[in-house]
Amino acid sequence: MPGMVLFGRRWSLASDDLVFPGSFELFLRVLWWIASLTLYLMHRRKLDCPGGVLLSTYLIVLLVLLAVIIGIVLAIVCVSMRGTICNPGPRKSMSKLLYIRLALFLPEMVWASLGAAWVAKGIQCDRTVVIGIIATVIVSWIVIAATMVTIVFVFDPLGGKMAPYPPCIPEHLDSNSSNHLLTGLRTAAKSVWETRVQCCCCCIGQDDNTRVAFSSTADLFSTYFSDTDLVPSDIAAGFTLLHQQQDKISHSREPSEVVTHTPGQPQETELDAEVENCHHYMPFSPVCSPWPVCVLNSSRVELCRTGNNFCRGRDIEYDAVEGDEHHCHFASILKTTGLQYRDFIHVSFHDKVYELPFIVVLDHRKESVVVAVRGTMSLQDVLTDLSAESENLELDIELQDCVAHKGIAQAARYIYRRLVNDGILSQAFSVAPEYRLVVVGHSLGAGAAALLAIMLRGAYPQVRAYAFSPPRGLLSKSLFEYSKDFVVSLILGMDVIPRLSVANMEDLKRRILRVIANCNKPKYKILLHGCWYSVFGGSPDNFPTELDEGNQGALTQPLLGEQTLLTRCSPGYCSGDSPLDSPKYPTLYPPGRIIHLEEEGGSGRFGCCSAAQYRARWAHETEFSKILIGPKMLIDHMPDVMIRALDRVVADRTACVSCPGQGGSNVP
C-alpha cells in the first residue's frame, strides 16, 4: 500500500508493516515489565536505604509507563493486522496510535535519564536492586536507540516533496507548469538515488567513468520507481505471491500442455558437441576472480598452501601479469586451470568501472586462443552492470539498429582496444597461428564476451563465444540474430540474470502490482506463509495466492487496487504506460543460441546441485522473457553450481551414448 504520511511527509513504511516489529517490541516490553515487577516485589523491603525512595519511585513509575506502552503497542499490532495491502481502510486509526506511541518516548527518555542520574549518585542500597535498575536503564536506552535507527531507515528523503502522492497532476496547472513540477520531482529523485549509490560505493575511486556510472544508475532507479507507491515489504510480499503462483500454475498444468520438442539427429549431435565445449570452457570463466574466491571454489586444500607460497616468495618471470602485485591471483589461476606459465599470453586484474579483468591463454587441448572475461566481483562491476542505458555500436557489418547495453558495451570496447591496439592477440597467434579464437565469460563477463566476439569477428571470422549466464538485456534484435552463428549461451535452471532486463523488470513490477491487488490476505500472513513455503515447501493451494472466484485471467486486467499503487505522473497516464518505455531503454535480447540446463525432479527447496539431475536442450529466447521467483534464482547463477551441473549433464549424456531411447529423452 502507499507509504504512511506522518508529520506531513511520506515514510517508507506502510500501516501493515508494524505486525512483526510491534510483536517483537511487545514481547520485549512484557518481559521487561515482568522482570521489573519481580524486582520490585522481591526487594521492596530493601529499599529503606539512603536514596531508596528514589529507586522505589523509579520502579513504580517505570511499571506504569511500561504498562501504558504495552497497551499502545498491542493496539498498534492489532490494527496493523487488519485489512489487506490495497485496503488500508480498517487501519485508518494507525497514524493516531503512532503519534501516541512516539509521544511516549519523551517521558521514557526523561525517566531513563533520571534513572541513570540517580544510580550514578552511588546510592547505598542492595546491590541486586541497583544492578537491576542499571539493567532497566540500559534496556531503555537500547530500545530508544533502536527506534532512532529504525526512523533513519524508513525515512524517505523525497517524502516532503511527494507526500501524499497525488493521484494526478492538479487541474489548475497548465502543461508548462505541470511539466516543470514533474521535472523538479524527477531531478530530486535522481539526486537522492545518486547520493545513495555514492554512499554504497564510497570506497571506490572517483573518475569520469565512475561519475557517469553513478548518474546512469541513479537515473535507472529513479525512473523505475517513479510511477509506483510501494514500500519494501510490499515488494517482498509480491515476490512471495508470485513464487507460489508460479508453482501453482506449474503443478496444475496437464502433461499434454507441456510443449516438448525432440530435435533431429543433426541438432542433437550439435547439442552434444556444444555441451561438451561448454563443459570444457566454463572453468576458464571464473579464473580471473580474486584468489580467495578461487580457493573457496576449489576442493583442493593444497591450493591455499600453494597460493601462499607464491604470495610470499616466488618472482613471476612473466611481465604479462597486470594488477597482481603479490602474484596471489595468478597462483590460484595456475592451480585451478592446470595450465603452465608458457600458456599465458596476458593476465589483467585491472578493475575499474567499464574496465574488466581478463586473461588470454593458449588452450592446447582444443587448439584455441581463449580470452576469458571476469564477471561481477566488485562494486565497479556492479556499476557497469547497472549502466543499463543503450548505445549504438559502430561495427563493420551491414546491420541496422546495432544497439547494446551501454555499460557492457564500453567494457567490451575496453578489452577490444587492449587486445588489438596493444598487440595481445597478435602475440598469441604468433605463438600458435593455427589456433582459433574463443571468447568466454560468466555473468557480466558473458555479456562482454559476446559483444567482444561481435567486435572481433571482422578480423577473426572463425571466432566463437561461450556466454555462461549472460544478462538478457544485452543486444538489439538484429545483433541477437547475427550472433546466433557464433555465440552459444548456457543458462542454468531458474537463474535470474539471463532473465534480467529493463523490460523484464518493468513486467515484474506490473505482475507484483496485479498479484498484490488480487490478494485478499493481510500482508503478515502472506510473508509468514511465504517463508514457510520457501523453506519447507508444500502445496501452493494452501497459501494466499488464489484469486477471488479462482479467476486467474483477471491478472491481465488493470484493477482499482493496482491503480492505488501507481503514481500517475501526467494527465495522460494510463496503467499500460511506463517511464521506462523510451528510446533510452529499448527491448534488448540475450546473445546467440541458448542451451538451457533444466532440473529434472527436485532436490529440495535449497537442494545441493550435486544431488540434482539436469537435462540439456536448445531453448528459445522467449522462454526467458519473464523473471521467475524461487529459492534457486540466485543459487543457479553461481559459477561453481553451473560447473557441477555441467559435470552431471556430461556424465549422464556420456553414459547414455549407447542408449538411444534414454539419450533422446534427455533432449526434449
From Swiss-Prot:
Which cysteines are cross-linked by disulfides? none
Regions of this protein lying in the Extracellular compartment = 39-58, 124-128
One annotated Gene Ontology cellular component of this protein: plasma membrane
Where found? Cell membrane
Look up the record and name the cofactor or cofactors this protein needs: Ca(2+)
- Stated role: Lipase that catalyzes the hydrolysis of arachidonic acid (AA)-esterified diacylglycerols (DAGs) to produce the principal endocannabinoid, 2-arachidonoylglycerol (2-AG) which can be further cleaved by downstream enzymes to release arachidonic acid (AA) for cyclooxygenase (COX)-mediated eicosanoid production. Preferentially hydrolyzes DAGs at the sn-1 position in a calcium-dependent manner and has negligible activity against other lipids including monoacylglycerols and phospholipids.
What family is reported? Belongs to the AB hydrolase superfamily. Lipase family.
Protein name (Swiss-Prot/TrEMBL): Diacylglycerol lipase-beta
Q: Which organism is it from?
A: Rattus norvegicus
Instruction: Specify the taxonomic lineage.
Output: Eukaryota, Metazoa, Chordata, Craniata, Vertebrata
The gene name reads: Daglb
